[in-house]
């Protein structure tokens, strides 16, 4: 008695189901294209998800939304010879590719399998096939940038927001971007409030050339002295 196992030659993982459907048409029967539906893991909203005392070690957790789609990916990965990570060519896309690879590795599904990272900037047959033909490694600098962004989001937002709610009733939240932006806006508003207008005049001369064209010029030197912005504080100084 023989047992025949169906083998998917190549598994391609993208972010969105719409892209998966289109790319599947371009690649044909030797490929199965599945969507991760965005990020598959995140930092749980609890203390200790990022540990600054342990080189900012981060604890990742699969959310309930992603479990269904991860099961489809893991089931397909078991039957695949090659796994192609084709998420978006940006910081977040690189992070998703890294998370998928790490997750499959933790599940011990990468043994004896080839895993590749491919990117394409448009969803056309030419761009997709060119990307498939030119795989590369996961860009660790982009992954590191994502981790720094996510760790700061957690450390600033998760830890400081509750303090704001306690100390400043009515406060919404703190954040990696919004808190800095609010600081800049506040400082600028203070500068505007403290601004005292100062009168100054500039000296311009118009010349007419032989053709009758008017040429406007700013006088920058008068009596061998450079004219500064506040050299003429009122009309009488000119």
Give the ranges of each region predicted by the language model:
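Compact Cys/His-rich, Zn2+-coordinating modules
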Residues: 200-238
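C-terminal or mid-to-C-terminal helical accessory/interaction module adjacent to the motor/catalytic core
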Residues: 123-207
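Intrinsically disordered, low-complexity regulatory segments
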Residues: 4-150, 164, 220, 225-236
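Flexible glycine-/small-residue-rich
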Residues: 14-15, 35-37, 87, 156, ...
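Structured core elements
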Residues: 11-13, 84-86, 117, 176, ...
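Short acidic (Asp/Glu) and glycine-rich catalytic loops that position anionic groups and cofactors
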Residues: 109-111, 157-166, 182, 210-225
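Short flexible coil/turn linkers enriched for glycine and charged/polar residues
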Residues: 27, 79, 158, 197, ...
């Amino acid at each position: 008695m023989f047992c025949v196992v169906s083998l998917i030659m190549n598994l391609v993982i993208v972010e969105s189901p719409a892209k998966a459907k289109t790319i599947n048409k371009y690649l044909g029967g030797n490929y199965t294209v599945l969507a991760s539906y965005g990020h598959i893991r995140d930092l749980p909203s609890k203390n200790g998800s990022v540990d600054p005392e342990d080189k900012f070690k981060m604890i990742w957790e699969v959310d309930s939304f992603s479990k269904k789609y991860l099961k489809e990916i893991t089931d397909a990965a078991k039957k695949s010879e090659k796994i192609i990570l084709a998420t978006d060519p940006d910081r977040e896309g690189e992070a998703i590719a890294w998370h998928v690879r790490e997750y499959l590795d933790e599940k011990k599904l990468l043994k004896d399998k080839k895993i590749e990272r491919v990117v394409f900037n448009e969803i056309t047959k030419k761009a997709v096939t060119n990307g498939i033909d030119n795989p590369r490694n996961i860009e660790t600098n982009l992954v590191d940038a994502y981790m720094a962004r996510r760790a700061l989001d957690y450390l600033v937002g998760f830890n400081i927001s509750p303090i704001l709610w306690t100390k400043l009733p009515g406060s919404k939240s703190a954040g990696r971007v919004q808190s800095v932006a609010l600081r800049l806006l506040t400082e600028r508003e203070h500068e505007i409030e403290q601004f005292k207008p100062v009168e100054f005049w500039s000296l311009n001369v118009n010349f007419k050339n032989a053709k009758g064209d008017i040429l406007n010029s700013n006088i920058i030197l008068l009596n061998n002295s450079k004219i500064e912005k506040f050299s003429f504080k009122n009309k009488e100084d000119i």
